[in-house]
Amino acid sequence: MTYVLQNVVFPLDRDPDLLPLYVDPETWSTIADEPVRVSSRAQIGNILDRRRARIVAGRRVSFGTYFNAFPASYSQHWTAVRDVRLRIRTTGPATILVYRSTGTGARQRIDTREVDGAAESVFDLVLDQYSDGGWIWFDIVADEKNAVFEGAEWTTEQEPARTGKASIGITTYNKPDYCIW
């Protein structure tokens, strides 16, 4: 059985200040001791709904963001999940590039796929090299025509752990009025 770990989503409202949390964060560099913005590719007008976005011809959009990148290091350390499947649905001519980061923040390309028409691209990823930190994400580059990102999910076949315990501590003694209103 397939279990969804994380859906790729966009902001519910059309607030451009929130967009960098979901797609294409701004990247800054320093040139001649001055900060320079080197990317600003995502535009709120290209978000079609909660799960879909237009990728304008010739443009590149990154999903290496707070809400849409997959926390590989955290998952490797704190869960039993070792195999993750990234499933991406697109329409139109595009190139999908899957990346990972190292514990030092270096970006490494894992895989690349060229797609056209209605396509579903599946990437099987193993969580065994992230003990020092790292994320997994993807970028989409539209070809000579617009493409549409139709949705994506990070999934696993690993059944979720359902065990757990809870403890309740009440810091008062013989004072039920303090606990119940």
Regions found by a protein language model. Give the residues of each.
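Cell-envelope/extracellular polymer assembly enzymes that use nucleotide-activated donors
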Residues: 165-169
